[in-house]
Amino acid sequence: FCSDDPFHTETKSSLYAAHNFLMLSGSKTFGIFIDFPSKIRWDIGYTTANKTVITIDGTNFDIYYIDGTKPLEIVKEFRKSIGTSYVPPFWAFGYQQSRWSYHNAEAVDAVVDGYNKAGIPLDCVYLDIDYMERYKDFTVDDEKFPNFKDYVSKKREEGIHLIPIIDAGVKKENGYDIYEEGRKNGYFCKNEDGTDFEGGVWPGIVGFPDFLRPDVRKWFGSKYKILTDMGIDGFWNDMNEPAIFYSVKGLN
């Protein structure tokens, strides 16, 4: 499982993100893609220098062996399986500024002013979790970023695109429409007994939308319109490995 922990040393078995594609080169070059959402152990020459051992904790998985004479051929075949990338808009190729975190609009303005004074072109500024109301997805803190739609438009006139973060965990809070819809419709990941799995990330206790389900992807995806209607035209999808700080019942 993934772990949102910056200290990834030899004693840390969990990576920050899971990418279940590996390309091996030796007497034969080939790729392996494992289509499985749960725990996988990768031992790449660690126990035995010339051996790779992959251990999958489960039975319901697919393994793709991708043959090819050159790495580029293998990568192209892999992308055919998972889907090719879309072509980003031109402005997305410009210089982008991000950090954790800009606490209010004034902090963003100061960064933009700094770039202008230094004569450095800037196209995008990323908004981390502090733009949200108590770290709730698809909300804006009106005290920190008042008149957000107008602010987005003002920055656009300055040539700056604002890219807000969206986390995979939906805050458990009565009256919060995103959470209420997810709970009512059974959109969150479940425990073995059918109850909602609950874990902790930035907002506290959250539910995790089950993105393996097309109906959940469609539901969650429709919520981005809340921000696109305010002029936002790019997003930073984060914590979607999923990252988790702790769980209520513990992880087995």
Segment roles from a protein language model:
Residues 1-89, 99-100, 105, 112-117:
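Catalytic and substrate-binding clefts that recognize carbohydrates or anionic sugar/phosphate headgroups
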Residues 17, 81, 107-130, 151, ...:
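Catalytic domains of carbohydrate-active enzymes, especially glycoside hydrolases
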Residues 17-19, 28-30, 52, 59-62, ...:
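Structural beta-strand/beta-sheet cores of well-ordered domains, especially the beta-sheet scaffolds
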Residues 25, 33-36, 44, 67, ...:
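Glycine-rich, histidine-containing beta strand-loop boundary motifs that form or position
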Residues 73, 106-107, 150, 215:
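An acidic, carboxylate-rich microenvironment
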Residues 81-98, 195-208:
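N-terminal small/glycine-rich loop or linker at the start of catalytic domains
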Residues 103-118, 216-226:
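Short, acidic/polar
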Residues 121-252:
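Aromatic- and carboxylate-enriched substrate-binding clefts and catalytic-loop regions
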